[in-house]
Amino acid sequence: MAEAGQPRPLTAFAPPPPLWKHFTPDNLKRLEEVKKEASKGEDGKPRKKKWTPAELRALQLPPELRFLVPPEIPMSGQYSVFGELQSLSTTLPSLQEQGIEQLYPSTPTETDPNKPSQPSRPFNHAYYLLKISKSLLLNFLEFVGILSITPEQFQSKVEDLRNLFINAHHLLNLYRPHQARESLIMMMEEQLNRSREEIQQMDKMHAEINGFLEQLKAQGIDVDSASKSGENDTAKRTTGDQDANNANSSRLVWDILDGTD
C-alpha cells in the first residue's frame, strides 16, 4: 500500500476525490429525509422548497452526509492540474512576475500601475504576434541546423523557442479582453439589425392590415347603401300591395251593400 505522504502519479485523467464513496443510495435517501423534516411547516406537513447550498450547509447533518452538500465556492488560493499549481485569481500575471523575458514592449499600465493612464497609442497585439511567429520560424530553422551540425548544443535554442511560445501565448491572453469586446459589439449589432428587420416587417404588416380594413370599410358602406335601397323598395312594394288589398276589400263591401238593396 502506498504511503500517505507519497505523491500520486500523474495520469491523463485524475482520479475522483475520496468523498465519492459517500454518494450511496442510502445516504442520498437519508439526505432527502432530512430535507423533508427540515421543510415542515407549522401544520407538520413538508413543503416544497428549493434548497440552496448555504441552507443545506446550515442543517445539522451527520459527517457522512456533509460530503453530499456542495461546498462554498473558493474565492482565492490555488489548485493543482496535472501536478502544476494554478491560481484562482483571474488577473493575468505579467511575464516579469513569472521570471520570463518579455520580447515585446510593455503598455503604460503594465509599466507603472499606480500612474494615472493617459491617452496613448493603442497596443498593436497583431503586429507583435506576427513578429514572434516569424521569429519562431527562424529559430526553428536554426534549431534544425544545430541538430544537424552540433546536436549537443540544442539546449539554448530550445529555451529560445520556449520563450517565444510563452510570449506568444501571453500576448494572446492579453488580446482576449479586446476580442471579447469586439465579439460583444458584433453580437449587439446583429441584435440591432435583427430588431430593425422585425420593426420593418411589423410596419409592413401594419400597412397591409390598414389597407385591408379600409377595403372592408368601403365594401361595408356599399353593402349598407345597397341594403337600405333594397329595404326602401321592399317597403314601397309592400305599401302598394296593401293599398291594392284595401281597395279590393272596399269594392267587395260596396258590392255586398248593393246586393242587399
Swiss-Prot record:
Xref: PANTHER family: MEDIATOR OF RNA POLYMERASE II TRANSCRIPTION SUBUNIT 7
UniProt keyword RNA-binding present: no
Amino acid composition bias (Polar residues), ranges on this chain: 241-250
Record note on quaternary structure: Component of the Mediator complex.
Name by which UniProt lists this protein: Mediator of RNA polymerase II transcription subunit 7
Main location: nucleus
Compartmental location: Nucleus
Stretches with biased composition (Basic and acidic residues): 23-45, 230-240
A Gene Ontology BP annotation from the UniProt entry: regulation of transcription by RNA polymerase II
Entry keyword set: Activator, Nucleus, Transcription, Transcription regulation
Database matches in Gene3D superfamilies: 6.10.140.1520, 6.10.140.200
Matches recorded under InterPro entries: Med7/Med21-like (IPR037212), Mediatior_Med7 (IPR009244), Mediatior_Med7_sf (IPR044888)
Family statement drawn from the similarity comment of this UniProt entry: Belongs to the Mediator complex subunit 7 family.
Role this protein plays: Component of the Mediator complex, a coactivator involved in the regulated transcription of nearly all RNA polymerase II-dependent genes. Mediator functions as a bridge to convey information from gene-specific regulatory proteins to the basal RNA polymerase II transcription machinery. Mediator is recruited to promoters by direct interactions with regulatory proteins and serves as a scaffold for the assembly of a functional preinitiation complex with RNA polymerase II and the general transcription factors.
Record's GO cellular component terms: core mediator complex; mediator complex
One of the record's GO molecular function terms: transcription coregulator activity
Chain segments carrying region Disordered: 1-55, 224-250
